[in-house]
Amino acid sequence: MAKLNVNPTRMELSKLKKRLTTSTRSHKLLKDKQDELMRQFINLVKYNNKLRKEVEDNLQGSLKDFVMARAVMSSEFLEEAIVYPKEHISVEVGEKNVMSVSVPVMNFKRQLEGDEGSIYPYGFANTSSELDDTLSKLYEILPQLLELAEVEKSCQLMANEIESTRRRVNALEYMTIPQLQETIKYIRMRLDENERSATTRLMKVKSMIEQRG
């Protein structure tokens, strides 16, 4: 590892030792952060996979019901039944902090038209129970869909932060800290050499003075 280009003085040695202490402490903190991020990320990915499977299974069930509804209803009645939604939905996206990562938090409000509280935007005279089942399941799936979007975005952001933290940890571990250690070692060696040279000169001067005396 190449050393830093600095003057081999005691002042520089003191500065570098402080930098090494700070870098070592930063490395430990970042490594701890990386480990905790990985732990939370793995848990979130497991939950994301479970939630995605539930959503996909529920959507598959809704699709089967819709196919059955199309089979027993005319296209005209089917289109008229679902063209005007009964429900209005608004979504508010906020943030929360997870290990210095800002991840999204989605809150949504649902408002049904009319006072009866029915989710079906049609009467039941010309529709089928399969269509009722389709809309009922989709109504229940919506919160899961929004949660899935929130969780998957959180996974993406945490993965980015893990990669960024990993690069910083590696830079400290394999470049900054070894460079500082090598430079400190070099300065100490040079200072020791200078001290030995100074001692040798003093001994020679002392010897010369004694001989003249």
Swiss-Prot record:
GO terms for molecular function: ATP binding; proton-transporting ATP synthase activity, rotational mechanism; proton-transporting ATPase activity, rotational mechanism. InterPro entries: V_ATPase_D (IPR002699). Keywords: ATP synthesis, Hydrogen ion transport, Ion transport, Transport. GO terms for biological process: proton motive force-driven plasma membrane ATP synthesis. It comes from the Bacteria. Produces ATP from ADP in the presence of a proton gradient across the membrane. HAMAP family: ATP_synth_D_arch (MF_00271). Belongs to the V-ATPase D subunit family. This is V-type ATP synthase subunit D. It comes from Clostridium botulinum (strain Eklund 17B / Type B). The gene is atpD.
